[in-house]
Amino acid sequence: ADVITRSDHLHLTAWSFFTDPPRSAARRAASLAHQSGATVSFDPGSFQMIQEMGVATFLATCADLDFDIVLPNKEEGQVLTGSDDPHEIARGVAKIFPGALVVLKLDADGALVLADDDFTHIPPATNKLVDATGAGDSFAGSFLAHHLVHRSPVEAARFATRVAAWVIEHVGARPAPDARLSTLTSTVR
């Protein structure tokens, strides 16, 4: 609990919400974070797991947690909202999680940021796909690292698309860092 209450931000994924005891721990962590003034972000994590659990049940486990940032991919957004249109998905997610900054990961189409009722499309940073493993997680982590320092969701999404592009141009979810990645990440400090 001390680590959470001393933190500025807590990131949760839906993998924590599918069963107990992780579900109870994640809910408690989000509550502690908010009580201590930290922000909380959420990545729905798996459209298949949401479908298996049932959308209504899934939302009942997390909709009341007042997430500050929600980072679904398009498939997760489709399952949560029933829409195929990225703008409608983002608006639907914003209705599910009122007040949250919504960053919709669009795979080969980049990302869509919905902040303060304004949409900004961020184009993809590459079209050279080698392996998409880890792209969404690298996007989310990069977005949060940049946004929590610079407080610009659009610039954070641009940064995240560049880091995710670097990831998908390599094999595996954790490619070895190189000079290009060092240059990309040096802007976060």
Regions flagged by a language model, labelled:
Residues 6-9, 141:
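A short small-residue
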Residues 9-92, 109-110:
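Conserved beta-alpha-beta core of the PfkB/ribokinase-like small-molecule kinase fold
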Residues 31-35, 82-189:
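Conserved phosphate-binding/catalytic region of the ribokinase-like
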